């Protein structure tokens, strides 16, 4: 933890200001920097601002989504994927302490994605590009599902730092600021465009993020 935290604190000085940002994104970036510089990464998921933006926890509708997962034919897979860990000190779901509302929600989204087309095979998805990757939960779930998958997140530099911490602490191997690895975190729009053109086939994930893009 301390080694990763030290690396992130160093990288937090490299503020990325090229791409335009909405005021909400600016506030989020400032809050993340506060968390990093005050050595609170170990419990960043208890930060109220981070929860408001990234984390769904004790909401009743999550219970119904969990029930739907349990009734699904793929429940043996979902059961493994919803297991929560202690990275970031997440709030556990009050009706299932082995998971969190946010992780249940992310897995539920994957299930609905599968339901949208019978031709989709999760095991055959090799490349994913996610726009706005939260704190890295969806990426972690897909890596857990398939450790050979190529996963690239485009987000703000400061959010990339949060993602790097979360994924690194989950024993993933994220690359910060480049696309040389299997799990890449980038914040340069030009870099994203070049990378996307190289990948002929990929799964594109954007959970609300496209609507937040500055025009």
Task: Please give the residue ranges for each predicted region.
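Short alpha-helix immediately C-terminal to the canonical SAM-binding loop
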Residues: 160-161
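Conserved SAM-binding motif I beta-strand of class I
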Residues: 150-156
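Nucleotide donor/acceptor-binding cores
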Residues: 125-126, 200-202
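S-adenosyl-L-methionine
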Residues: 166-198
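Conserved class I S-adenosyl-L-methionine
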Residues: 124-134
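A short SAM/SAH-binding and catalytic strip from SAM-dependent methyltransferases
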Residues: 202-214
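Conserved SAM-binding loop of SAM-dependent methyltransferases across substrates and taxa
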Residues: 135-146
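Conserved Class I S-adenosyl-L-methionine-dependent methyltransferase catalytic core
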Residues: 9, 13-120
């Amino acid at each position: 933890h301390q080694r990763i935290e030290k690396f992130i604190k160093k990288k937090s000085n490299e503020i990325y200001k090229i791409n335009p940002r909405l005021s909400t994104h600016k506030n989020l970036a400032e809050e993340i920097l506060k968390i990093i510089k005050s050595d609170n990464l170990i419990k960043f998921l208890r930060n109220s601002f981070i929860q408001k933006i990234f984390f769904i926890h004790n909401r009743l509708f999550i219970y119904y989504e969990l029930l739907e997962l349990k009734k699904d034919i793929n429940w043996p897979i979902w059961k493994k994927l919803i297991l929560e860990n202690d990275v970031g000190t997440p709030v556990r779901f009050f009706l299932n302490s082995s998971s969190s509302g946010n992780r249940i929600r992310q897995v539920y989204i994957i299930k609905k994605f599968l339901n949208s087309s019978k031709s989709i095979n999760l095991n055959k998805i090799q490349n994913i590009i996610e726009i706005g990757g939260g704190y890295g939960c969806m990426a972690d779930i897909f890596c857990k599902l398939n450790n050979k998958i190529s996963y690239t997140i485009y987000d703000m530099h400061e959010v990339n730092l949060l993602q790097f911490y979360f994924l690194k602490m989950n024993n993933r191997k994220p690359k910060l600021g480049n696309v040389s690895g299997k799990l890449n975190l980038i914040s340069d729009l030009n870099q994203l465009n070049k990378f996307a053109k190289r990948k002929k086939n990929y799964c594109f994930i954007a959970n609300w993020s496209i609507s937040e893009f500055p025009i």
